[in-house]
A protein has these predicted regions:
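S-adenosyl-L-methionine
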Residues: 1-12, 20, 24-25, 33-42, 144, 148-204, ...
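SAM cofactor-binding core of SAM-dependent methyltransferases
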Residues: 100-107, 115-118, 122-160, 176
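Conserved proline-anchored active-site loop of SAM-dependent methyltransferases
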Residues: 117-130, 209-228
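Short, glycine/acidic-enriched loop or turn micro-motifs at the edges of active sites
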Residues: 122-124, 145, 180, 218-219, ...
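Mobile active-site "lid"/loop adjacent to the S-adenosyl-L-methionine
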Residues: 216-247
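Conserved Class I SAM-dependent methyltransferase catalytic core
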Residues: 244-290
Length: 292
């Protein structure tokens, strides 16, 4: 099914690239949040092109650099590199495994052959990649411009990797505040999201996603030093969700068929809202709100 949709997906990604630029202009980070503008690419990859040099659009924090090498764009601090990449997820996308993923089970819409999902808190897009591998068309929102640049770089690399391309072509990144965009969707107002969805699904009378996925960052409890450092580096750019009530209420107002929320397995409900049901794993729990 994924291969059969490649032509539509290619057209969608061309449109998404334009929308990604527009969203960045509209929702760019405040320059007061950073000390100075820095970009340190390998000399072999230096370019005057904004497409090749995405960091020219924004500032990076003090003592942190963006570097591009043969592996792609990375955030670097004190010898620690942080790079978005989907290749390690490939074994989990096997047809016999993907539908056993707890996230996919939580997001599944019975009887829907071409479901649409919105990942309102994309981060590095790993969960969206799993949803896309399961057959979802996924719109990813990331509000931080640096994380968005790292994610877009990973998507661009994935579309050039044969074993990842069919999945990545079902993922569209929009750099914008998801609360603003979801509010526009629920009210019928024009926005980057609504324009993108209309272009992708011109025959749909009602623009409504089947699933909205929320993954507000929560404290990482793993004993792995490498993973702890990774989250420390992410938190330099973006803090855990501070407006969880607004995020959840805005998602619920869209009235998708499901809202799925990722939480620590023993953590409280997001905004203290009780879901329709939950699916529990060893470390995480998916709280599901179901609508008719």
């Amino acid at each position: 099914m994924l291969e059969a949709d490649n032509i539509r997906a290619d057209k969608k990604r061309e449109t998404a690239n334009t929308h990604h630029i527009n969203a960045r202009k509209k929702d760019s980070a405040s320059p007061t949040a950073f000390d100075k503008e820095v970009f340190t690419p390998d000399s072999a990859h230096q370019s005057n092109s904004n497409k090749e040099n995405p960091a020219c659009h924004f500032n990076v924090p003090k003592n942190v650099t963006l570097q591009r090498n043969e592996k792609g764009l990375a955030l670097v601090k004190d010898g620690m590199e942080l790079r978005a990449d989907f290749l390690s997820l490939l074994p989990r996308t096997d047809h016999n495994k993907i539908h056993r993923e707890l996230l996919v089970r939580a997001a599944k819409i019975k009887g829907e052959q071409n479901p649409i999902a919105i990942d309102a808190t994309a981060g590095f897009g790993e969960d969206s990649f799993l949803l896309a591998a399961a057959g979802f068309t996924v719109y990813l929102f990331e509000r931080d411009p640096i994380i968005a640049a790292l994610l877009q770089d990973a998507l661009d690399r994935a579309t050039q990797t044969p074993e990842l391309a069919a999945i990545a072509n079902h993922m569209t990144l929009i750099e914008a505040n998801s609360i603003t965009e979801l509010a526009a969707l629920s009210s019928g107002s024009s926005s980057v999201l609504t324009e993108t969805m209309r272009n992708d699904f011109p025959d749909k009378e009602t623009l409504r996603p089947d699933v909205i996925y929320l993954d507000p960052m929560f404290p990482e409890r793993t004993k792995s030093a490498a993973v702890k450092k990774k989250f420390q580096l992410i938190h330099i750019l973006e803090n855990p969700c501070e407006n969880e009530e607004e995020l959840l209420s805005t998602a619920l107002n869209v009235r998708p068929r499901k809202v799925v929320i990722k939480r620590p397995v023993k953590g409280p409900f997001l905004a203290n809202a009780k879901p329709s049901y939950s699916l529990k794993g060893k470390a995480v729990r998916y709280d599901c709100f179901v609508f008719a």
